[in-house]
């Protein structure tokens, strides 16, 4: 497995996501999984539109928050990307709605979607929205 990490605090959303992605993918190669972390100071649609064509067949997961905690600072503006690549990496993703109103249902639907991928074991990352309080019920 190869891992690439990239970060940018460029003012423009498209420039920031491109810089972060290129720094990450130059180390990892074509990603099977891309983790995207952004701050709320950016146009999230522009970030998404810019990034999606570049991840190829890989999957995307992540979230937007008020800051990104780095090794030496907390960044109130930035885009962080972690890319994972390797022939042995298999990725499935599931995006669920209504976590707050139906946490058990959201968890069940996510589990069913992940099981339908055919993978028998793996690691699950959960990125709920910041306003959800029922994450334990979902899990």
Language-model features and meaning:
Residues 1-139:
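Cofactor- and metal-binding active-site motifs of prokaryotic enzymes
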């Amino acid at each position: 497995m190869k891992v690439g990490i990239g970060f940018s605090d460029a003012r423009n959303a498209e420039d920031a996501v491109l810089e972060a992605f290129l720094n990450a993918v130059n180390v990892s190669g074509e990603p099977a999984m891309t983790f995207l972390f952004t701050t709320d100071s950016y146009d999230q649609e522009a970030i998404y539109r810019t990034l999606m064509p570049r991840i190829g067949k890989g999957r995307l997961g992540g979230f937007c928050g008020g800051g990104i905690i780095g090794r030496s600072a907390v960044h109130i503006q930035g885009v962080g990307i972690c890319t994972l690549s390797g022939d042995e990496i298999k990725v499935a993703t599931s995006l669920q709605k209504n976590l707050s109103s139906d946490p058990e249902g959201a968890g069940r639907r996510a589990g069913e979607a992940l099981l339908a991928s055919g993978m028998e074991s793996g690691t699950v990352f959960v990125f709920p929205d910041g306003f959800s309080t029922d994450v334990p019920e979902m899990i």
